[in-house]
UniProtKB/Swiss-Prot annotation:
Annotated positions binding heme b b562: 83, 182
Organism of origin: Vespertilio sinensis
GO molecular function, one term: metal ion binding
Cofactor(s) recorded in Swiss-Prot or TrEMBL: heme b
PANTHER family: CYTOCHROME B
Name this polypeptide is given: Cytochrome b
Length: 379
């Protein structure tokens, strides 16, 4: 008699995706982040659902409803901080996942990679919408500043901003629609994740060597399920430590002040995970130019497969490319630091140089270095 997991129409799909899935025998812990991202998404949906039961999307009561959750709801503070810091964990895993994809050449699975970049955009949009909901000072002014950037679009910009706001300023209509979209988007993300996995299982996983591993595969369960559970425990440890000991470490103190349209905070800045893009936006003294640079800082990921000039897929055996990769990481950390600083010298010039270097490394220096390495291998 055939095992039920291999014959049942529904369980069969799960079996082929998570149990009997052939996986390369040499994938390292850098391949753990896909499963961690799935767990982060599930955590965000569950905690978000319970928070939505107590939240009111009205400008008069939104701030107080969040306060009420933390004070009066049983373990409401745990839900709230799990959700807020869960978003930070989500982005840490996302950036590590993308970084691994760049380092090991996983972007050569074009459909999977492009789907992943679309997912990144969707998660960033969801996080931005969620940051507006507590209706603190930084929520209100962040929403005002970021949505206002759309007015840089020629001809339709001003109308588009008024349309998104639902009026002539960020107000009740804006908050209500932001809540509606923030609730909806995670389910769209979950559907996109299914497509992402569908494309991945068409080709199979990449591995650290970048060499096809069809002749050396092992079943996903128990080998990689156990390995993923270890990663999960590490993430739970980090997240629970954050939530229990310093839940506000990654937040902004300004968001504990109710939104006031008549008082602008001294430094308007987004959450830490957007600071690198915010620094690129601010480094260009022209509104439209800044918006384009901001969008292209993420869109540039789409062209990675086109910029791959090396004969080797992975960077594992390419020391010069490795140096450039870590230079890019250092550059991104510099941009993240600059994004949180006031707009004054020397931060302005550092931000401008780091922004130029960011695009230069990806579009020019990395492809040229790969070509040079191809020639070195002939010797």
């Amino acid at each position: 008699m055939t095992n039920i997991r291999k014959s049942h129409p529904l369980i069969k799909i799960i079996n082929q995706s998570f149990i009997d899935l052939p996986a390369p025998s040499n994938i390292s812990s850098w391949w753990n982040f896909g499963s961690l991202l799935g767990i982060c998404l599930a955590l965000q949906i569950v905690t978000g659902l319970f928070l939505a039961m107590h939240y009111t999307s009205d400008t008069d009561t939104a701030f107080n409803s969040v306060s009420h959750m933390c004070r009066d709801v049983n373990y409401g503070w745990v839900l709230r901080y799990l959700h807020a810091n869960g978003a930070s964990m989500f982005f840490i895993c996302l950036y590590l996942h993308v970084g691994r994809g760049i380092y090991y050449g996983s972007y050569m699975f074009k459909e999977t990679w492009n789907m992943g970049v679309i997912l990144l955009f969707a998660v960033m949009a969801t996080a931005f919408l969620g940051y507006v909901l507590p209706w603190g000072q930084m929520s209100f002014w962040g929403a005002t500043v970021i949505t206002n950037l759309l007015s840089a679009i020629p001809y339709v910009g001003t109308d588009l901003v008024a349309w998104i706001w639902g009026g002539f300023a960020v107000d009740k209509a804006t908050l209500t629609r932001f809540f509606a979209f923030h609730f909806l988007l995670p389910f769209i993300i979950a559907a996109l994740v299914m497509v992402h996995l569908l494309f991945l299982h068409e080709t199979g996983s990449n591995n650290p060597t970048g060499i096809p591993s069809n002749m050396d595969m092992i079943p996903f369960h128990p080998y990689y399920t156990i390995k993923d559970i270890l990663g999960l425990f590490v993430m739970i440890l980090v997240l629970s430590s954050l939530v229990m000991f310093s839940p506000d470490m990654l937040g902004d103190p300004d968001n504990y002040t109710p939104a006031n349209p008549l008082s602008t905070p001294p430094h308007i800045k987004p959450e830490w995970y957007f600071l690198f893009a915010y620094a690129i936006l601010r480094s260009i003294p022209n509104k439209l130019g800044g918006v384009l640079a901001l969008v292209f800082s993420i869109l540039v990921l789409f062209i990675f497969p086109l910029l791959h000039t090396s004969k080797q897929r992975s960077m594992a055996f390419r020391p010069f490319s490795q140096c450039l990769f870590w230079l890019l990481i250092a550059n991104l950390l510099t941009l993240t630091w600059i994004g949180g600083q006031p707009v004054e010298q020397p931060y302005i010039i550092i931000g401008q140089l780091a922004s130029i270097l960011y695009f230069l490394i990806i579009i020019v220096i990395m492809p040229l270095t790969s070509l040079m390495e191809n020639h070195l291998m002939k010797w």
